[in-house]
């Protein structure tokens, strides 16, 4: 990328003017070209001993090249990243913003300051955005593809496969694993890596035998408290890298009498307080992934003991319930207004709103918040579903809730 094309006229006067900007822009091309030439001259069969002049010269050159980008004036760096961030609001162009954060530490810190969280920008940029609450106004629109043969579910950013095409951004993937006591969905940042020991592992969804109760686990502690009591933790079998935290419970109402009607569900968000949707309410967003794989192994008693310290768990969590549909006499079916995002009737379709009645009348929750759809999910074609979510839940939480709708529930229908 030619950085000189991104500069406004006023930036040409900063720290040496156009000549310095041109040199900086051209240096990146020279760095890449020289490295490829050096590799070609040495060949794959050449082995450089440790401490040799070759390795020392390479480290010197890398340090020199690194300093070129570090020494950019902050005003100029801010202006460059702001222009890239404003011009690339959609994927795959959004990759340029991610590339800015990969140059060096100073670029990464500046990019983190410029790029806002999804709650404010309505955009998903970094992997951590998948754990941050969605926007308050317009929802983030996604779609899910189901592969029946492999039991894999993939979440993409976009309106639909037909409209997004090859520009669809893969956000999360889940693989269904059958257990003797129920089903388990392993959620990953990758499309084909579902190992719990992998850095792509983000969490899981586990069901009971009847498929009426689901528990959402995350491998990162909630941002409001890095130390949770034993009731909110799952003891790892091997090491602390496989630690899981109970962040939500999904309950489907039993239909013992087999009466006619849609499914009824309730979601208890253990990591989101009811105050998040109150007037002036906020929720703390995670800012980074904690690398638990580098931590030392801990004995199981550390997770089972009650002396963990930290703040208390949320006493009044946010509760979501499915919006009651209306019966359409002419169509002879239950209907909800999905505003064109759902086109095929299915028992899996639902809309979730805040259960204000269960929270009590004195919770100071505005009426518009009580009627606002926080998550909606529905079918638009064979093995294709839409998922739209908004504040205060994250993409991972929304995806986990939608995955629960795919599991078979013979006693709930």
UniProtKB/Swiss-Prot annotation:
Tissue: Ubiquitous, with higher levels in flowers.
Segments traversing the membrane: none
Domain of life of the native organism: Eukaryota
Molecular function terms from GO: transcription cis-regulatory region binding
Domain (F-box): residue spans on this chain: 67-122
BP GO annotations: pollen development; regulation of DNA-templated transcription
InterPro entries, per database record: F-box-like_dom_sf, F-box_dom, Tubby-like_C, Tubby_C, Tubby_C_CS
A Pfam family annotated for this UniProt entry: Tub
Family listed: Belongs to the TUB family.
Protein name: Tubby-like F-box protein 6
């Amino acid at each position: 990328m030619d950085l000189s094309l991104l500069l406004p006229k006023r930036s040409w006067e900063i720290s040496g003017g156009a000549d310095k900007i041109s040199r900086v822009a051209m240096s990146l091309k020279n760095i890449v070209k020289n490295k490829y030439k050096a590799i070609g001259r040495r060949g794959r069969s050449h082995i450089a001993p440790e401490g040799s002049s070759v390795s020392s010269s390479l480290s010197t050159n890398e340090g020199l090249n690194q300093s070129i980008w570090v020494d950019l004036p902050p005003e100029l760096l801010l202006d460059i990243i702001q222009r890239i961030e404003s011009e690339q609001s959609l994927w795959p162009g959004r990759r340029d913003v991610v590339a800015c954060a990969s140059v060096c530490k100073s670029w990464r810190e500046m990019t983190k300051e410029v790029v806002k969280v999804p709650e404010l920008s309505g955009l998903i940029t970094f992997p951590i955005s998948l754990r941050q609450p969605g926007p308050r106004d317009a929802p983030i629109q996604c779609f899910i593809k189901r592969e029946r043969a492999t039991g894999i579910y993939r979440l993409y950013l976009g309106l639909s496969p037909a409209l997004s095409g090859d520009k669809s951004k893969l956000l999360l993937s889940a693989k269904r694993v059958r257990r003797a006591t129920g089903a388990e969905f392993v959620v990953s940042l990758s499309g084909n890596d579902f190992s719990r020991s992998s850095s792509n592992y983000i969490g899981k969804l586990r069901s009971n035998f009847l498929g009426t109760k689901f528990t959402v686990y995350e491998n990162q502690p909630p941002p409001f408290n890095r130390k949770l009591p034993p009731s909110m933790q799952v003891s790892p079998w091997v090491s602390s890298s496989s630690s899981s935290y109970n962040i939500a419970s999904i309950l489907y109402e039993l239909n013992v009498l087999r009466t006619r009607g849609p499914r009824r569900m309730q979601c208890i968000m253990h990591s989101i307080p009811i105050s998040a949707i109150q007037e002036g309410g906020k929720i703390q967003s995670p800012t980074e992934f904690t690398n638990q794989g580098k931590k030392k192994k801990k004995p199981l008693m550390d997770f089972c003991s009650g002396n963990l310290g930290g703040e208390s768990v949320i006493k009044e969590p946010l509760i979501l319930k499915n919006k009651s549909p209306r019966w359409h006499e002419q169509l002879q079916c239950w209907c909800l207004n999905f505003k064109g995002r759902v086109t095929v009737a299915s028992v899996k379709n639902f809309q979730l709103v805040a259960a204000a009645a269960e929270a009590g009348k004195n919770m100071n929750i505005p009426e518009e918040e009580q009627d606002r759809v926080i998550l909606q999910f529905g079918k638009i074609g064979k093995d294709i579903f839409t998922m739209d979510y908004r504040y205060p839940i994250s993409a991972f939480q929304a995806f986990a809730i939608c995955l629960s709708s795919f599991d078979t529930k013979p006693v709930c229908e």
